[in-house]
A protein has these predicted regions:
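Accessory cap/linker subdomain of secreted extracellular hydrolases
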Residues: 13-15, 20-125
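Catalytic histidine neighborhood in serine/cysteine hydrolases
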Residues: 152-171
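Glycine-rich nucleophile elbow surrounding the catalytic serine of serine-hydrolase chemistry
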Residues: 1-10
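Conserved alpha/beta-hydrolase "acid-adjacent" motif
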Residues: 139-146
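Short beta-strand/loop motif that positions the catalytic acidic residue
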Residues: 126, 132-134
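Acidic beta-to-alpha connecting loop that harbors the catalytic carboxylate
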Residues: 136-138, 168
Length: 171
C-alpha cells in the first residue's frame, strides 16, 4: 500500500517470467499529483506529519524507526501560522532533517525534478496480471491508483488488468 504500491509498480516492469500476478495498492503514480502535492497544491499538514516521522535522514542503515517529529503545540494550525513560511517549517521544526521537504519547496512547478520521478510513462512491458486496488476515501494516492490502471491499459493492451475501488481509505 502506498510506497510499497509504487515498488510493486516498478517491479512489474519487464518482470521475471515467474511473476504471474501483482497488486499495486494505493500506488504513487506521479509525485507531483499524488501524496504531498495534489495537482501542485501542497498538502502541508500531511507532509509535515508523514515526512517528519518517516523521511528523516539516517547516518547508517537501521531497523529502528526515527522518532516522530515534535509538535511544539497541540494546535497544528497555530504551528504553521507561527512558522510563517514552509522554509521556516523546515528550519525551525524539521531541523533540515528531511531533505525531500526542501527539494519539494525548491520545485513548486511540475518541472524536470517531478517529471523524471513519475513512473506512469514507464509502465511498459508489463506481463503479469495486474489488480490495482484503491479506496474512494484515499486522501493520499487516489490519483496514482487510477492513473496506474489507465497507463497499464494503454501501454499493455494484452495484459489482464483490473481496478478494484471500495469504500475505504488509504491502506
Amino acid at each position: 500500500v502506498s510506497y510499497p504500491g509504487f515498488y510493486v509498480s516498478a517491479g512489474m516492469i519487464d518482470a521475471h517470467p515467474a511473476l504471474v500476478a501483482v497488486s499495486p495498492q494505493a500506488p504513487v503514480g506521479d509525485w507531483y499529483f499524488d501524496d504531498f502535492l495534489h495537482n501542485g497544491a501542497f498538502f502541508l499538514a500531511h507532509a509535515y506529519r508523514w515526512l517528519g516521522g518517516n523521511a528523516q535522514e539516517r547516518a547508517k542503515p537501521t531497523a529502528e524507526r526515527s522518532p516522530p517529529i515534535a509538535y511544539p503545540t497541540q494546535d497544528g494550525y497555530q504551528l504553521f501560522l507561527d512558522a510563517v513560511s514552509n522554509d521556516n517549517v523546515s528550519k525551525q521544526h524539521l531541523k533540515a532533517a528531511v531533505p525531500f521537504w526542501d527539494e519539494m519547496m525548491a520545485h513548486p512547478n511540475r518541472d524536470e525534478f517531478w517529471q523524471k520521478r513519475a513512473i506512469l510513462p514507464h509502465l511498459k512491458k508489463v506481463a503479469p496480471a495486474v489488480m490495482v486496488v484503491t479506496g474512494w476515501y484515499d486522501a493520499e494516492d487516489l490519483y496514482g491508483s487510477f492513473k496506474t490502471y489507465q497507463a497499464i491499459e494503454e501501454l499493455n493492451p494484452n495484459v489482464n488488468n483490473v481496478l478494484v475501488v471500495g469504500p475505504w481509505h488509504h491502506g
